Amino acid sequence: MLSLLKRAIGYTNERQLKKYMRVVEQINRMEPQMEKLTDAELRRKTDEFKEQLASGKSVNDIQVEAFAVVREVAKRVLGMRHFDVQLIGGLVLAEGNIAEMATGEGKTLVASLPSYLRALEGKGVHVITANDYLAKRDRNLIGQIHEFLGLTVGLNLPLMSPQEKKQAYQADITYGIGTEFGFDYLRDHMVYDASDKVQRPYHYAIIDEIDSVLIDEAKTPLIIAGKTRSSTELHYIAARLVKRFEREVDYIYDGETKTVNLTDEGIEKVEKAFGIDNLYDAEHQVLYHYVIQALRAHVLFQRDVDYIIRDGKVLLVDAFTGRVMEGRSLSDGLHQAIEAKEGLEITEENKTYASITIQNYFRMYPILSGMTGTAKTEEKEFQRIYGIDVIPIPTNRPKIRVDLPDRVYMTRHDKYVAVAKEVKRRHESGQPVLIGTTSILQSEEVAKYLDQEQVPYELLNAKTVEQEAEVIARAGQRGRVTIATNIAGRGTDILLGEGVNELGGLHVLGTERHESRRIDNQLKGRAGRQGDPGSSQFFISLEDDMFRRFAAEETEKLKAKLKTDETGCILNNDIHEFVDKVQRIVEGMNFSVREYNLKLDDVMNEQRNVIYQIRDRVLEENDRVALVVPMIRSACDRIVDAYALSEQIPEEWDVRRMTEELNRIVYRTPITFDQPPADLEDVKRKVAEAVESYVALLEKKKAHTQLQTLLKSVMLTVIDDYWMRHLDQMALLKEGIGLRHYQQEDPIRLYQKEGFEMFKAMYEVIEKEISVHTARLLQSLEQEEGQS
């Protein structure tokens, strides 16, 4: 077995494989022993394992027997036996790494092993799937193993009630989609009572299709937002204005980072249109926001690629799956800018209440693991950002899929003509063909060329997503032609129909190289599952987006040297080297963008952690007076520092304003000063005496239940209000960072520095506002007591 594995993977992982195979051999030796156990004896193993862990043993100590138990139960309950390579996958996951397993190798069954082992620790296991359909399917299938062994299995889906969610999270193992776990985290930090939280502390997660979740979806932050009114008229005016803008004249578009910035000429046009002198004055910050969002909508978002319009509404499309993202909308007025661009009715704008990136959410798990068919190409990113390794797992049966060399054409038209003819040729032989496209627009374009060749097909894209799994599952039937946007239906096995093996299996035809070899490999992986025959080939053109956006000049220079046949197919062998080089450049750029965005979000993440920790203390502490007292002291010190300046003489101080500010905070011990005060020490002494007297009063009142309850409400309201305002300010700061970049300043350093200053200022306001509200609370409570 080991020699077979070596040949399959290569010698770089030989040491790791030897280590895993030694454990697999131990598990295999236990199989006869497990087969002799009764169902009841197998069930009792769970309690035995828990007792061993409680007595000081580690999960590694019980791993071999636990895996052997799960394998035996899977045989009895599901009629499925884990192969040796699946056991290796389970061991990789249990360690907190990524198991790279080919399509069709039974990743779902693999997850049953580490999820059981880690659930025995009693801290909860989260199994993350690509969509709701897979979460339900896997919970119902693999959940049978765990429930047989006495563990509880939960399902976490959108639109569940808080009570249902709490129950799901209390289960030993919880299935669901990653975004919903992230949204629950944000919602838990918006509650006003600790008992309303649904999650418990994080422990261990297994992410299916981990590359899709942590890399592809990482560009889109999770945002909880509410509705707020925006200026409909300004959106329409800005949309009309930028429609007349010219690239490189009025704005600069960076195709690599997908950013746009106004040039000096563009700025002048905006100032002239609105009759203002300086667009960058603080008073025009909101106007700048409307204009830049209109420009983004105009340049960065393409209809039927990034969004579709259905029933007069803009619906976003997931760039990586081609699915419509139901219920999702862009924040900060960008969605409304797209509506204005399309001349649609403007909906209410979303105001951000809470947000977090996918990366920073999953970095909170102490142990993170995952499975995918394609991760090795992004191993450095997984190591740098998440500290996890990618371990390739050999296939159970040798892979016999044939990956044919790319066919590269000069023009898109020539490419699509060739695609249609190739599909027709294979269709006439009865071989099923799966055509992978990168957008809805491209799907529909391919469909037109197939119509011309009178080839019947099924079109699967964001507009027809309802039967996705069924359509993909049928794609391996004889004579079937399926056009699928990107990796739609991922997680659904394509089973070959009768007689298809003899025809060469499923043929996958890619119509464009993706921005990552990993996604190309995902598409190829739809064919040749579990040792089935199959083939793949990409048809690409030098007019494809990848070349236009990232290598326009080099492509134009190269064209003059190229030779083609009568179909427009390029004959030069070095064209393949050029294509690979451009794709690697794009991969590097995309990684840099993700890394840049993560560095920016790390600033927000630190701030979010501070605010959420304070919020949690307010929720969980019984004595909130103890939390307020340091705030009162700090707020009073800052008032003195603001008005009694050491570089001025006391006669120059604004003593009246200082006294007013202090007396709003210090209740029942009014502060007065000589006119003018003797010196700064005199001021500080009097303030300290008054504050300590007031603190003593608060200490006496802290047993008052109503005071503690009202303090909790006031503190949370103030924190949430100013945190939401701060999120808006940070979004505007981030927006302006692009302009600074244009001015050759380091954007990340500036964002860190200015973001910290803004956070510090916000926190000081929070302390002051809570202090003022505390004084008012105390006053109203004493008045109530006096009246009763």
From Swiss-Prot:
Record's keyword terms, sorted: ATP-binding, Cell membrane, Cytoplasm, Membrane, Nucleotide-binding, Protein transport, Translocase, Translocation, Transport
Entry EC no(s): 7.4.2.8
Topological relation to the membrane, as annotated: Peripheral membrane protein
Binding site for ATP: Q86, G104, E105, G106, K107, T108, D493
Classification via SUPFAM superfamilies: Helical scaffold and wing domains of SecA, P-loop containing nucleoside triphosphate hydrolases, Pre-protein crosslinking domain of SecA
Record field: catalytic activity: ATP + H2O + cellular proteinSide 1 = ADP + phosphate + cellular proteinSide 2
Chief place where the protein resides: membrane
Keyword Thylakoid: no
Annotated compartments: Cell membrane; Cytoplasm
GO CC aspect terms: cell envelope Sec protein transport complex; cytosol; plasma membrane
GO biological process: intracellular protein transmembrane transport; protein import; protein targeting; protein transport by the Sec complex
HAMAP family per UniProt: SecA
Family to which the UniProt record says this protein belongs: Belongs to the SecA family.
Function description: Part of the Sec protein translocase complex. Interacts with the SecYEG preprotein conducting channel. Has a central role in coupling the hydrolysis of ATP to the transfer of proteins into and across the cell membrane, serving as an ATP-driven molecular motor driving the stepwise translocation of polypeptide chains across the membrane.
Subunit (UniProt): Monomer and homodimer. Part of the essential Sec protein translocation apparatus which comprises SecA, SecYEG and auxiliary proteins SecDF. Other proteins may also be involved.
Record-given protein name: Protein translocase subunit SecA 2
Lineage, uppermost ranks: Bacteria, Bacillati, Bacillota, Bacilli, Bacillales
